[in-house]
């Protein structure tokens, strides 16, 4: 750790004036970026949304799929051709953990690499780089919830993300998360409740609880006697909190107690992201998903019985190594049967460091893309069916903002995660409104204020 006198500290603070942050990937990365932005603004720096106008550039990266990595590497490579001598470039996020110091070999112009478990070290790393002129790297494996979340610079004024658990212990064979974010670490419930109360006092209406597997919350700290559903009951008592969401769930860990909480708690939205990944038992076993199709469907049936109006989301991967056409058809039939409200569909790409990387990627790319397109087309018909079912219904909408394309309209979401547009002004932003649906456009419902 460096020790600086007052003159050196003054030089360091004068060395950086504006910063730029680009975020790739999931909601966890978005929250991590908000925390880093808060640190930098507390340091006295000004945020710029133009990378050419900043002398500190931070790229918060994603490794979950090959395309995400290639986008980042392409962007960072171009910066090496144009970088000014004063600019400092940092790489944070999952790529930092996955590639570590090899990033310096491929991209010698970057100045620091900061892992997902080290974002609280951002200012210390900047001080080291500025004082020494040398590259710096921190990519610890273990995470402690010691970050000052209360000083995070939120991107939204209505909705906020709150981290409750980090890491994952499931080790699906295709997934880098256990290697980039470490093992599961739950955050103390009193700290979560404190942050949520703080956000509500600032005017936030909706909180989304984040974790790679929120259903594992508290299982690593049984002495707390606070599992995920227990936490939700405590959050429901916070005055002024209108809505609570959560993501993501692992099918193995979702409990009857959680389903009953969704049914009973006024704040908890009736939407569950419930990743299937594949509709073939053999493929699921090869993925190490630790459930069968039959067990998955049992959970879906139980959830729909307890919460009849629940909306389900999912993730599905096509073209996993050795997947046959018949096994793909099993996935296709399940997608058609369950009729997800939201589906994120992907073709498989090998990720370095995962067990699946050792297997031959034997499904040709054109076959992967054909299967993906067939699922996308099916899901489009399901989306159409869902949208038509809303016609004539009156739904509760949390108004989030003016519509970007037509400022005569405002945009909000229903409790089940549907986008809604209707006529209104700034006075409606942040309020709950009843809206009658009369039409739809692509993924958006259209309505009239009641």
Swiss-Prot record:
[4Fe-4S] cluster 2 binds at residues 168, 172, 175. GO terms for molecular function: 4 iron, 4 sulfur cluster binding; metal ion binding; N6-isopentenyladenosine methylthiotransferase activity. It catalyses: N(6)-dimethylallyladenosine(37) in tRNA + (sulfur carrier)-SH + AH2 + 2 S-adenosyl-L-methionine = 2-methylsulfanyl-N(6)-dimethylallyladenosine(37) in tRNA + (sulfur carrier)-H + 5'-deoxyadenosine + L-methionine + A + S-adenosyl-L-homocysteine + 2 H(+). InterPro entries: Elp3/MiaA/NifB-like_rSAM (IPR006638), Methylthiotransferase (IPR005839), Methylthiotransferase_CS (IPR020612), Methylthiotransferase_N (IPR013848), Methylthiotransferase_N_sf (IPR038135), MiaB_methiolase (IPR006463), rSAM (IPR007197), rSAM_horseshoe (IPR023404). It is found in: Cytoplasm. GO terms for cellular component: cytosol. Keywords: 4Fe-4S, Cytoplasm, Iron, Iron-sulfur, Metal-binding, S-adenosyl-L-methionine, Transferase, tRNA processing. Binds 2 [4Fe-4S] clusters. One cluster is coordinated with 3 cysteines and an exchangeable S-adenosyl-L-methionine. It comes from the Bacteria. [4Fe-4S] cluster 1 binds at residues 26, 62, 94. Catalyzes the methylthiolation of N6-(dimethylallyl)adenosine (i(6)A), leading to the formation of 2-methylthio-N6-(dimethylallyl)adenosine (ms(2)i(6)A) at position 37 in tRNAs that read codons beginning with uridine. This is tRNA-2-methylthio-N(6)-dimethylallyladenosine synthase. It comes from Protochlamydia amoebophila (strain UWE25). The gene is miaB.
